[in-house]
Amino acid sequence: MKLMVLVFTIGLTLLLGVQAMPANRLSCYRKILKDHNCHNLPEGVADLTQIDVNVQDHFWDGKGCEMICYCNFSELLCCPKDVFFGPKISFVIPCNNQ
């Protein structure tokens, strides 16, 4: 029984001592807007491009079409498109990365 407790303690110590490896996935993040206005985006987010004129307050972040941002009053919420829309409909969202 003591051996079992010792093995468990050593195993738990090793698990807690190992640093977690970050996943190779993109994650969500928020950007606070200084002027609290989605129509006048600040200079710091100049890499945003509007998805479509019919889809208000939704932007592609960066040059690709992997991250999408939604402007909600005082902040931008940016997530990978699969997280934002779900994998079943994310492929139908128009992407103009030119």
UniProtKB/Swiss-Prot annotation:
Tissue distribution of the protein: Expressed abundantly in the central nervous system of adult, but not at all in fetal brain. High levels of SCRG1 transcripts are also observed in testis and aorta.
Domain of life assignment: Eukaryota
An annotated GO BP: nervous system development
Residues glycosylated per entry: 72
Keyword Metal-binding tagged: no
Signal peptide positions (record): 1-20
Protein's cellular compartments: Secreted
UniProt cross-references to Pfam families, sorted A to Z: SCRG1
GO CC annotations, alphabetized: extracellular space; Golgi apparatus; neuron projection terminus
InterPro entries per record: SCRG1
Keywords of this entry: Glycoprotein, Secreted, Signal
Keyword Glycoprotein: yes
Family classification: Belongs to the SCRG1 family.
The protein's name: Scrapie-responsive protein 1
Source species of the chain: Homo sapiens
This protein's encoding gene: SCRG1
